[in-house]
Amino acid sequence: MLCKCLVTCLDYKRPVPEKQSFFKNHVKNLSILIDNTPSLPYYENQRTAMPLKRKVFHMEVILGIDIGGSTTKIVGLRTDGSVLSMLRVRAEDQVTSLYGALGNYLTSNGLTLKDVRRVVLTGVGASYVEGDIYGLPTCKVDEFSASGTGALALSGQDSAVVVTMGTGTAFMWAEKGGTVRHLCGSGIGGGTLGGLCRKLVGMERFGQIKKLAAQGDLGQVDLTIADITCNPAPTLDPTLTAANFGNLAEDASPADLAAGAVNLVLQAIGTMTVLACQCCDTRTVILTGSMTTLDQVKPNFENFEKLYGIHYIVPENATFATAIGAGLCSLKKNAVD
């Protein structure tokens, strides 16, 4: 009989739930199931007990790979759409990041090239890749379709404004069934945050900025409504920002500056989500991308929710939404060879 072992994925450690359809459990299964051949010789005919050549069992894995401006995200999907595991790799150039992510993923999960049914590329860096990767069938999905499909699948929504907060920020309208429409984009995003913090505090790595900003005091950086009036409008909370970096103290610490930069970027994105919702006549926004892991995301978008009545959703594994969507689009035959 086949024995099955569970190998915990690289980025996440949690109890492994029962294998379910991707659309039912919204990617809560974050481990990979590998079929191993028996340790003893395989006997096809138990009566003769003649040892035959061991049978090797291969999985059929679809790899969705999102090649972004600074990081590459890779997700393995079973043919039923359920997630195997996820991995994120940073590299100086996108092609190196792609091949590094693929090799790392296969090794970490005990897979071989024969286990891969198809590679599906998306993201800005996909344009630099031509032909098949390592001889594997390779196709491409446009980033907007992948982002919209992944966001809806992860959140369980039928329609929503989808915001991908990557190096820049993209705004889309997505509907269940494959309709994804690009609304607009903004140059303000993770790249903005990295550039500002490199100049302000000498850091540009996302993990470093995230840790530093969590210790900062916005009162040392931003001007609030309470700072400029004692009689604000009834609908406005006095603690809301009136001007980003409008009250910069001379003794502001690096942590304060980092917090101010994070606040500026998130509030700019939040303002654009309000306009996008008005354009699409909706009050549901799904936030995806690496920046969703910032501690300041929740309080910032809670303020927008109170002000404008918009429901913001940050689904589990939002960082990998586009890579997951690429794989799902491939299963729906929306990929381009």
Where do the protein language model's features map onto the residues?
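Adenine-nucleotide phosphate-binding core of ATP-dependent small-molecule kinases
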Residues: P234-T284, T319
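Short glycine-rich, Thr/Ser-proximal phosphate-binding strand/loop in the N-terminal lobe
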Residues: V61-G100, V180
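Glycine-rich phosphate-binding loop plus the immediately following alpha-helix
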Residues: G178-C230
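Glycine-rich phosphate-binding loops at beta-strand->alpha-helix junctions
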Residues: L121-S127, L275-Q278, T282-F304, T319
